């Protein structure tokens, strides 16, 4: 017995073995002869009273067969021990070697108990009693601590086994364990029942509260609707409660009980040992087991909660796995269980029954469309406060109707209840089909009732909605008709008044223009005659004046000299002569200056006269004034010819491209780039005339900045010069070659009618070849617009007009729509905020100069925007006043504080 013990049981075929696998007994096999088996049968009958509790448990729970078998094994083992004790008086042979070997084996680690497997009981091959057997260690630890002698049975010979000493208190200990387990099970069942009752009470309270709220809101509904809704709710509650009970019984039922109590070993680590002499090491190991089990149960509890949340509070999904083919980690597939789940009804067998139900259930889908239509009508009417009460009632009725519909989840719950109680037998299948047919009939009845209720509710709601729609349509029609009549009347009155006013103003302005034209013609004709007379008279009068003034001066000198001679005495003659010489020199200088001025004026007058004569010769129309005055066009040309000589900026049209009015150059246009300025500054990027440092000539740039105050360099005119009203020789914007572009942001958004290109006159300019020849104008809605062409124009230098105006193509707007047929076409012209000028060619010079570019047009009135601007200006003015008041208050407070400080000092 010192090593591994291997009995030769093949020589004794009449022997039978009995496994002893309790937690308080060694895992060895005790072989018995037929004589001992008779004793075993007698003791079983005698000790039937000890197994009464197990029979009660078996009868109370039909699925507790494993618990019953385990208790039966315990009782059989106890009876065998009692019989062996009766024979111990005759065979009191002890084996010290066996006890010593078991004491040596008890030094093995106690933690190997968890890895012990006793599934090889039925094998008839060699059986090894190794020193690492955990159950033998546990047995020896428990019996070694007791004061009583231990007894074992020796099977080393083929004869009857030798009976050793056995522990007498083992029977009591096993009974205590069974009672404790039963008590724990009863307590757990009671706790579960209490929890279920509490949950049911809470659900009932919540449902009662919901019913009270619904009843308060649905007092106006009919009694039939209330009765149907309450019956549907009760049925739904019963279905939910039954499904919850079946699910709980499914997951806490027989498989788990069999898992814990089906085997002879007890895996529960929280049992208390009555032996007071256990060592501290065993207590520590038990505490470690408890911690592990607590961790496992906490993880399982958290997983269950997550599963419930993942199902969106609709309950646990019912699955129908085929346990015969697949293996999962669920407790139903554990090896310790002997239940065969392949006998259950599969999902495939229930498909035809369920399909019949869902085919009938497709009828309700058509009612969902009606619900959607009704909800849309409710949303349309919910915007008005008049129909709030009716809309709330309709919403509540729809909720009740929707609750009455059966879902697939509820059908699955009903099927799961039936499957939990029936196996794969033919009789049970027929019973299950009968139950399903009954349930389907009940469902069809419920559907028919719900259909009738739905039809009634839908007809009532549709009638109410139709009435509401008709009322609202009538009200809207009345309001719209009244507003349309008012609008038409106001339009007629306004149109008549405006037409009369416009006609009056037009006639008045036309008459005034005719009068002004006549006055201008008469005035200009008189001015021309006066100019001719003045020119002739000025030539003669200027010469006469000069001679007369010279003579007068000489006479004055003579008189003055005579007077001086008389007044001066003989003593001061020398001084007088010196003074006389000085005075004469001063007078001569003054005379020379005045004479030079007069000669210059005379020369200028002669030059002007010659120019006028040459102009008259070049224009024969001026000679025949009598013929040209008869037509207005001739008069206008005559006036323009005369004004061209003296001035050049008198077109009397608003320029929206004027820089002083708010126009500017747009450098950030998306599709147009401003050309580079000519000439560029050395050591600087010419860009747009602003002069920025270039990467290659950075040193020259800083050198020029440092020496600019000593050696000033000429700067080119920027592109903004074309927006300046002052036009002088050289004050132009130039760019290289004859092709260039520039974008102008107008002062205001206008409808463009005309464009004016201005250059200095050929009589003044050094070279007229730098003037632009052909150019194109684009109208832009904003800086990122491609633009629309307003026309291509040519600036003619052969005509004696340095300021030339061109009419622009009219572009219709795409946004505005004309509703009135009498509306003018000018009101539908597109407005532009930017203008792009593209020079196509010049008159042959290496660069091109633009002196001034003008844009003419008119603003289209927008009364809404004007009102917004007025409101914004008023608000800003009020805010400024408030700010000024606050500033004054702060200043007053500061002054008061300063006075107080000065008084304190």
From Swiss-Prot:
Residue intervals annotated with topology Nuclear: 1-290
Membrane topology, Perinuclear space segments: 312-905
Coiled coil in keyword set: yes
Gene Ontology cellular-component annotations: nuclear envelope; nuclear inner membrane; nuclear outer membrane; nucleoplasm
InterPro entries: SUN1-5, SUN_dom
Domain SUN intervals: 662-860
General function of this protein: May have an important role in defining the spacing of the nuclear envelope lumen. Essential for centrosome attachment to the nucleus, maintenance of correct ploidy, proper mitosis, association of the centromere cluster with the centrosome and the maintenance of genome stability. Requires direct chromatin binding for inner nuclear membrane targeting.
Summary of subunit composition and partner proteins: Homodimer and homooligomer.
UniProt name for this protein: Sun domain-containing protein 1
Gene: sun1
């Amino acid at each position: 017995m010192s090593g591994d013990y291997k009995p030769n049981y093949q020589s004794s075929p009449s022997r039978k073995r009995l496994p002893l696998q309790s937690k308080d007994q060694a895992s060895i096999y005790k072989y018995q002869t037929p004589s001992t088996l008779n004793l075993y049968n007698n003791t079983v009958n005698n000790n039937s009273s000890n197994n009464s509790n197990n029979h009660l448990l078996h009868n109370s729970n039909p699925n507790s067969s494993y618990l019953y078998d385990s208790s039966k094994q315990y009782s059989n083992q106890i009876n065998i021990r009692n019989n062996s004790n009766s024979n111990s008086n005759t065979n009191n042979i002890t084996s010290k070697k066996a006890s010593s070997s078991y004491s040596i084996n008890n030094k093995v680690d106690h933690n190997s108990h968890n890895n012990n497997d006793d599934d090889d009981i039925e094998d008839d091959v060699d059986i090894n009693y190794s020193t690492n057997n955990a159950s033998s260690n546990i047995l020896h630890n428990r019996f070694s601590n007791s004061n009583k002698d231990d007894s074992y049975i020796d099977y080393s010979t083929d004869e009857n086994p030798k009976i050793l000493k056995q522990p007498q208190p083992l029977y009591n200990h096993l009974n205590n364990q069974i009672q404790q387990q039963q008590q724990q099970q009863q307590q757990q069942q009671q706790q579960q029942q209490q929890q279920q009752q509490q949950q049911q009470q809470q659900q009932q309270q919540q449902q009662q509260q919901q019913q009270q709220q619904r009843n308060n809101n649905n007092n106006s509904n009919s009694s039939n609707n209330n009765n149907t809704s309450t019956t549907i709710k009760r049925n739904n509650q019963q279905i939910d409660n039954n499904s919850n009970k079946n699910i709980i019984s499914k997951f806490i039922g027989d498989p788990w009980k069999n898992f814990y109590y089906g085997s002879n070993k007890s895996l529960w680590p929280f049992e208390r040992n009555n032996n007071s002499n256990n060592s501290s090491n065993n207590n520590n190991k038990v505490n470690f087991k408890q911690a592990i089990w607590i961790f496992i149960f906490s993880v399982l509890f958290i997983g269950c909660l997550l599963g419930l949340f993942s199902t969106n509070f609709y309950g646990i999904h019912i699955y129908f796995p085929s346990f015969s083919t697949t293996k999962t980690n669920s407790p139903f597939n554990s090896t310790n269980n002997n239940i065969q789940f392949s006998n259950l009804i599969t999902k495939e067998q229930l498909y035809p029954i369920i399909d019949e139900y869902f085919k009938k259930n497709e009828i309700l889908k058509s009612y969902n469309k009606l619900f959607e239509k009704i909800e849309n009508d409710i949303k349309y009417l919910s915007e008005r406060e008049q129909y709030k009460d009716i809309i709330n009632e309709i919403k509540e009725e729809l909720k009740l109707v929707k609750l009455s519909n059966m879902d697939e989840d509820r059908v699955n719950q009903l099927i799961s209840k039936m499957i939990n109680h029936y196996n794969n037998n033919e009789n049970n299948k027929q019973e299950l089909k009968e139950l399903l047919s009954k349930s389907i009939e009940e469902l069809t009845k419920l559907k028919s009732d719900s259909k009738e209720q739905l039809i009634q509710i839908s007809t009532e709601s549709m009638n109410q909605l139709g009435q509401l729609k008709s009322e609202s349509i009538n009200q809207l029609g009345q309001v719209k008709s009244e507003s349309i009549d008012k609008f038409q009347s106001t339009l007629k009155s306004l149109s008549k008044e405006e037409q009369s006013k416009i006609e009056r103003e037009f006639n008045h302005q036309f008459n005034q223009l005719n009068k002004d034209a006549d006055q201008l013609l008469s005035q200009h004709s008189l001015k021309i005659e006066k100019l001719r007379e003045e020119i002739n008279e000025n030539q003669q009068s200027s010469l006469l004046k000069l001679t007369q003034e010279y003579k007068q001066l000489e006479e004055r000198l003579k008189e003055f000299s005579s007077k001086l001679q008389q007044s001066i005495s003989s003593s001061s003659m020398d001084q007088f002569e010196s003074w006389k010489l000085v005075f004469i020199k001063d007078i001569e200088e003054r005379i020379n200056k005045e004479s030079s001025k007069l000669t210059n004026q005379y020369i200028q007058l002669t030059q002007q006269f010659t120019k006028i004569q040459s102009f008259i010769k070049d224009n024969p129309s001026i000679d025949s004034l009598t013929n040209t005055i008869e037509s207005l066009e001739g008069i206008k040309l005559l006036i323009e010819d005369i004004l061209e000589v003296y001035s050049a900026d008198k077109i009397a049209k608003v320029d929206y491209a004027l820089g002083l009015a708010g126009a500017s150059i747009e450098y950030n246009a998306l599709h147009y780039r401003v050309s580079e300025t000519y000439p560029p500054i050395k050591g600087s990027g010419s860009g747009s005339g602003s002069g920025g440092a270039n990467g290659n000539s950075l040193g020259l740039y800083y050198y020029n900045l440092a020496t600019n105050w000593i050696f000033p360099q000429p700067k080119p005119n920027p592109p903004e010069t074309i927006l300046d009203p002052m036009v002088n020789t050289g004050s132009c914007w130039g760019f290289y070659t004859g092709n260039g572009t520039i974008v102008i942001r107008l002062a205001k958004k206008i409808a463009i009618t005309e464009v004016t290109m201005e250059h200095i006159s050929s009589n003044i300019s050094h070279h007229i070849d730098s003037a632009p020849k052909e150019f194109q104008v684009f109208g832009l809605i904003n800086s990122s617009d491609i633009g629309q062409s307003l026309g291509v124009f040519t600036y003619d230098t052969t005509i004696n007009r340095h300021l030339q105006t061109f009419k622009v193509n009219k572009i219709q707007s795409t946004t505005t729509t004309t509703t009135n047929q009498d509306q003018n076409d000018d009101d539908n012209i597109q407005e532009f905020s930017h203008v792009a000028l593209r020079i196509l060619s010049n008159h042959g010079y290496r660069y091109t100069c633009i002196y001034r570019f003008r844009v003419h047009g008119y603003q289209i009135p927008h009364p809404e925007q004007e009102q917004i601007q007025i409101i914004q200006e008023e608000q800003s003015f009020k805010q400024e006043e408030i700010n000024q008041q606050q500033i004054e208050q702060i200043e007053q407070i500061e002054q008061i504080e300063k006075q107080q400080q000065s008084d304190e000092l």
